[in-house]
Amino acid sequence: MTQRKTAFLVAAAMTATMGLAACSGGSASNGASDGSGVKVTWNMWAGSTDDEKWVADTADIVRSQNPDIELDTQTSSWGDYFTKLTANASSGNLACVTSMNGQRLSGFHQTLSPLSDEDLKKAGIDKSAFADGALDILSYDGKVYGVPYDVAAMMVYYNRDMLAETGTPEPAADWTFDDFVATAKGATTDAHKGFAVGMGEFQWMALPIAKSGVQPVDPSSTLQLTDPAFVEAAEWYADLVLKEKVADPVPSASEAGWGEDQYSNGNVAMAVDGTWNAVGYFTNDAGFKAGATRLPSGDKGSLGLVLGSGFGIAANCEGAERDAALKVLGSLVSKEAQDLIGSSGRSFPALKASQPAYFESLDESIRDDIKAAFEAAFSDTVGQNSTAKWTQVNEYFTPNLVSVYSGAMPMSEMLSQAQAQFGN
């Protein structure tokens, strides 16, 4: 997913860089077998002053719940976080508590320690207390590698003013792909298009996945970009630009947030993006009235994916340090910490009991609309299948999507080339 201002929660730090090893400052010989008297470091990505306040407040919750554990925090910007994580992983030098984005887990799962039911029990974590599919976010090959702090789903956002101006009905929660095309056509005029295509992984793939009922990766973590149903749906998506003329081509690969930016600036009637940007869109600076609803459905229903980020335990974290890290993990996703996330309106908590706090934090003028959109968007979501080469696949897509949208490269060719390059 494109990481924008509120893309999944970001955190703060006592230091400006990720620094050295996280599990330093304490060892099995220095702490009790239950993890008390040990120093633990929590590593997170950070992007703003607000993010820093969130991590500081969250760290205070952890410390208050675990006064016998010394907690340090380290952060880096989103852009640098995974680069530095790769470097630290190669030396076996990860923070005991390492934050992880679900879409990137496949490339880092070997650096994290699988969490057993006994581990979760030690951490005080009840799996049944989390939203449906939430534990799938940080699971890989049947093993749980982390616990999520938020959940997200993709939605179609629309400009209510633009639809009213063109006499186009607003989407209903049970709309179909035929309805989607009709809405895009109805809202397309000489002055603006009815839709803006995406460049980010799920900003563009969400509709083909929903239409085909097929994920680009199968349950065995095998890339299946040339699955006939997925290819057909992806070609339909490209044709929104090439044949239906309801969307403009993307000018260049540097326009990584093309669809989202076109929508938020009031230039188009619809775009696809995640629930994490709902508040920003509903309070947009362009001044239009926003709406949102679930992805449309087709002959195979409407397959949506539950996405998010969370926290894991590094594989190099052992003994008393690991026991202490499990306690920290439990506190990071405790109701108190999840209520903090929800009440700030920053992200939608993974813990079911804390989700009402998110809606209560919203202004009354947008609360009911966002709540209805979320309820629809999360109604049929499943966990994302992923592969170790998923990041490389999406890096390949970015420049080539520009060629697809311009008509210089067929969508089927882009998918087949990616399958040939990354499918083995």
Task: Label each PLM-derived region with a short phrase.
Residues 116-130, 173, 194-195, 214-233, ...:
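Short, solvent-exposed loop/beta-turn-alpha elements that line the ligand-binding surface or hinge
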Residues 107-116, 134-170, 198-220, 306-314, ...:
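Periplasmic solute-binding protein
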Residues 368-419:
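C-terminal capping/gating helix-and-loop segments adjacent to ligand/active sites or protein-protein/ligand interfaces
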Residues 61-129, 165-167, 262, 269-270, ...:
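Extracytoplasmic "Venus flytrap"/periplasmic binding protein-like
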Residues 64, 166, 242-244, 283-347, ...:
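Extracytoplasmic/periplasmic substrate-recognition and gating elements
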Residues 95-96, 123-162, 193-194, 291, ...:
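A structural signal for short loop-to-beta-strand junctions that line the ligand-binding cleft
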Residues 184, 222-251:
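Glycine-centered hinge/linker elements that transmit conformational signals in sensory
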Residues 1-40, 64, 416, 420-424:
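Short, low-complexity disordered leader/linker segments with a strong preference
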